[in-house]
Amino acid sequence: GVTCSDLAAEASKKALAAAGVDASEVDLIIVGTVTPDMMLPATACLVQDKIGAKNAWGFDLSIACSGFLYAMQVGVQFVATGAHKNVLAIGMDVMSSIIDYSDRQTCIIFGDGGGAALIQPSASKEDGYFIDFLHEVDGSGGDYLCMPGGGSQFPASAQTVADKMHF
């Protein structure tokens, strides 16, 4: 099937083409996802290879719905400090790979998709700029929407699969 890195690579190619930037000019790739292709390596590393961004390094952020916004904020910080000039911020999820379709309360609200944006320094405010970011989190509801299987609390096993802990 189609993987997270497949979709992320396609979105990245489109973002680079729209900006007129070659993949070899990308410095950093940040992927916000909770559905990586695998635990290791990072999806950003797989995207780096798939698009030919041989000079880029990258990492993933595991932040679910707001992953793209967090990837953008982190990318903006790398550009604002002058550390990098071309940062790909990607938000991508293949939720169909982890949805329990027998649970009608949740399966109808999730889907596959995402996008990519190239973040670069701006010569002037007329070119566009980020004003600010405001993020909040409330971890108190973590038990209501979670996938407990596969982490350090409940390592992947035949039992966690049988108990549907990976959905």
Feature roles, as predicted:
Residues 2-6, 33-87:
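Conserved catalytic cysteine-centered active-site region
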Residues 6-16, 107-108, 112-167:
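Hydrophobic pocket-lining "lid/loop/helix" segments that shape and contact the acyl-thioester
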Residues 11-27:
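Phosphate/pyrophosphate-binding loops at sites that engage ATP/ADP/AMP, CoA/4′-phosphopantetheine
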Residues 27-33:
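Short glycine-rich or small-residue beta-strand-to-loop segments that form or flank ligand, phosphate
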Residues 32, 62, 87-93, 111, ...:
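Short beta-strand segments
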Residues 37-40, 69-70, 95-99, 139-142:
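Short, well-ordered, mixed-charge alpha-helical segments that flank or form enzyme active sites
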Residues 78-114:
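Flexible, glycine-rich active-site loops centered on histidine and acidic residues
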